[in-house]
């Protein structure tokens, strides 16, 4: 048996094929892992204005996003259906800080304390566009939501419940 293995028989081809497949799988897994970050890592590594949702057709991923929204505890302030409560309704036509992907991602990851005009983020250009009677600042969820992909799915659900952002309206 050792003779066949060392001599290049069918065993060496099988081992070579297995090593090739293992290498390909390992490389792919490493590549996929490199693409996924925590929300805080994504914010830190991406210049302002550059964050863009990988789910432009948000209706297809909305159900999964809603499950993640509930699991992260967003419903405690915004309500289970996004209609508000002690925080702003996600169904409003005007969102307090704006509705672009980059702003929504940073707002959820960093909280409103980092977006207020009086601090460094406010000096970077974040201004309130709407006003709501809210109980207090939104806490940051960048360390609660595990991956940037999970946060993008939550944003997809938020957009899906907002009349102004749905293609078919309300």
Predicted regions and their residues:
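Short cysteine clusters
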Residues: 74-77
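C-terminal capping alpha-helices of c-type cytochrome domains
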Residues: 136-169
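Electrostatic cytochrome c docking/interface patches
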Residues: 38-70
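Bacterial N-terminal signal peptides
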Residues: 15-24
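Boundary at the C-terminal end of the N-terminal hydrophobic targeting segment
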Residues: 27, 31-33
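Gly/Gly-Pro-rich "capping" loops immediately C-terminal to redox-active cysteine motifs
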Residues: 56, 66, 79, 83-117, ...
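Sec-exported extracytoplasmic/periplasmic mature domains
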Residues: 70, 109-113, 156-163
């Amino acid at each position: 048996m050792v003779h066949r293995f060392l001599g290049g028989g069918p065993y060496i081809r099988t081992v070579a094929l297995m090593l090739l497949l293992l290498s390909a799988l390992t490389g792919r897994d490493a590549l996929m892992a490199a693409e996924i970050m925590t929300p805080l890592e994504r914010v830190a590594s991406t210049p302002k204005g550059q964050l863009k949702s990988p789910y432009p057709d948000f209706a297809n991923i909305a159900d999964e996003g809603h499950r993640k929204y509930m699991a992260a505890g967003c419903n405690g302030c915004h309500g289970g259906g996004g209609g508000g409560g002690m925080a702003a309704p996600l169904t409003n036509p005007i969102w307090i800080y704006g509705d672009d992907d980059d702003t929504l991602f940073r707002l959820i990851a960093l909280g409103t304390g980092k977006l207020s005009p009086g601090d460094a983020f406010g000096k970077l250009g974040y201004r309130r566009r709407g006003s709501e009677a809210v109980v207090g600042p939104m806490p940051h969820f960048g360390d609660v939501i595990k991956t940037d992909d999970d946060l993008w799915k939550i944003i997809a659900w938020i957009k899906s419940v907002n009349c102004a952002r749905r293609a078919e309206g309300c």
